[in-house]
């Protein structure tokens, strides 16, 4: 299933990942590159799909879109993909590439997630500061220096363009964190925040 932002599997729990990488083509490396791409395809299997992404700006630009998985399963898949990408020298994680994490969240959970990220623990080093304005705390802070409320952030995000904010609270129950580093610790940081938001909502509901 997709929503209007073309994000698949948004109705499933867990964390979904989109991993972008570039391929530097050399005629003499054609078989080598083809082998690497086949290894990736076989490893991902039915757990995700491959698409092209022209914004990466290489001869061949690839985006792996993984279904949402629980943390332990996702770690195994992520690590395997990184192993293959790291082995083949023609596969590059350039300044135009990034890892995007997606979570399903209803309105209350989105708000709790936003409040947890803006309570002082946010770490901008977890983002790749490329052509996208990925520094979430800058977009969460008004020109006066005051932190925007969740409702104000949503209005601002829609005004400037959701694609270019580091953390996007999209329609159809979706939260997207864009342009992360190719590092499991960074994915875990946001997984922790998401699960803390879930626990907060559960505690409020139980009262």
Predicted regions and their residues:
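C-terminal accessory/tail domains of diverse enzymes
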Residues: 1-94, 106-207
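Short, conserved phosphate-binding/catalytic loop or strand-edge motifs used
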Residues: 97-99
């Amino acid at each position: 299933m997709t929503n209007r932002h073309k994000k698949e599997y948004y109705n499933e729990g867990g964390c979904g990942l989109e991993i972008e990488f570039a391929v530097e083509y050399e005629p003499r490396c054609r078989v080598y590159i083809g082998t690497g791409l086949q290894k990736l395809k076989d490893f991902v299997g039915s757990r995700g799909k491959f698409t092209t992404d022209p914004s990466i700006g290489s001869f061949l630009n690839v985006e792996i879109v993984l279904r949402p998985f629980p943390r332990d399963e996702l770690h195994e898949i992520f690590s395997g993909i990184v192993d293959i990408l790291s082995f083949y020298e023609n596969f590059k994680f350039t300044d135009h590439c990034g890892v995007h994490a997606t979570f399903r969240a209803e309105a209350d959970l989105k708000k709790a997630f936003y409040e947890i990220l803006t309570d002082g623990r946010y770490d901008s080093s977890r983002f790749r500061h490329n052509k996208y304005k990925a520094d979430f705390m800058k977009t969460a802070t008004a020109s006066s220096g005051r932190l925007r409320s969740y409702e104000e952030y949503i209005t601002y995000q829609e005004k400037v363009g959701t694609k270019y904010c580091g953390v996007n609270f999209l329609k159809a129950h979706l939260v997207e964190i864009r342009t992360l580093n190719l590092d499991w610790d960074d994915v875990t940081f946001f997984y922790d925040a998401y699960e803390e938001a879930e626990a907060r909502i559960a505690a409020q509901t139980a009262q």
